[in-house]
């Protein structure tokens, strides 16, 4: 009997874990249009009511692949519940690439679109921008946050945000409502 139990445990340990549904993948080069930096492969997967972002890195001149331990893994970076669209996009610029997490959602109370911008800066996955617009209970709203310049524009009104340390913009603990929790956007 112990032999069977041991065999079952061994078999269970060697089987792969249940795969999460892949929602979107994107790849690029953190150096942007020059293509002379580190490459990356980003994957957005379904994780219960949230979306998980996982990023693997590659060296200059070699493609990143989804093997081994990822450089970045945040299991709750974006909203998953009520999502009608979830995708990753890469915006290449002369100053580097921005990885965008795009979520569109709809429920009985409203609709909206959230875009979170990430860059790899000084060995940190950094949130550099956040945009949330939509309608809630018949009332429209919009919040656009430029974390490079610490400026938030809410419903057409611009305000200067208090400076924060570099670590405060680390994407590893960013969640779908972090911009509200940290005071970058306000709830009306």
Which role fits each region the language model picked out?
Residues 51-69, 117-122:
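Beta-propeller blade repeat segments, especially FG-GAP/WD-type strand-to-loop junctions
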Residues 38, 50-52, 110-115:
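Short, surface-exposed coil-to-beta transition loops
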Residues 5-14:
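Bacterial N-terminal signal peptides
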Residues 15-19:
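Sec/Tat signal peptide C-region and signal peptidase I cleavage site
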Residues 21-33, 80-96:
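Beta-propeller blade termini
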Residues 96-188:
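Acidic, small-residue rich beta-repeat scaffolds with periodic aromatic anchors
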Residues 31-45, 54, 92-105:
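Acidic/hydrophobic-patterned starts of short beta strands in beta-sheet-rich repeat architectures
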Residues 66-81:
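A low-complexity, Ser/Thr/Gly/Pro-enriched, surface-exposed linker/loop concept
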């Amino acid at each position: 009997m112990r032999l069977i139990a041991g065999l079952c445990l061994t078999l269970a340990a060697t089987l792969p874990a249940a795969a999460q549904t892949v929602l979107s993948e994107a790849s690029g080069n953190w150096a942007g249009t020059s293509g002379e930096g580190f490459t990356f492969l980003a994957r957005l997967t379904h994780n219960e009511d949230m979306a998980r972002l996982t990023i693997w890195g590659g060296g200059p001149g070699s493609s990143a692949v989804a093997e081994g331990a990822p450089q970045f893994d945040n299991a709750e970076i974006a909203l998953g519940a009520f999502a009608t669209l979830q995708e990753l996009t890469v915006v290449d610029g002369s100053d580097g690439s921005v990885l965008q997490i795009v979520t569109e959602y709809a429920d009985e109370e409203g609709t909206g679109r959230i875009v979170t911008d990430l860059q790899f800066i000084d060995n940190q996955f950094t949130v550099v921008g956040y945009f949330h617009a939509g309608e809630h209970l018949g009332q429209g709203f919009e919040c656009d946050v430029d974390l490079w310049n610490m400026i938030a524009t809410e419903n057409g009104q611009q305000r200067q945000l208090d400076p924060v340390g570099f670590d405060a913009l680390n994407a590893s603990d960013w969640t779908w409502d972090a911009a509200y929790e940290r005071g970058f956007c306000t709830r009306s």
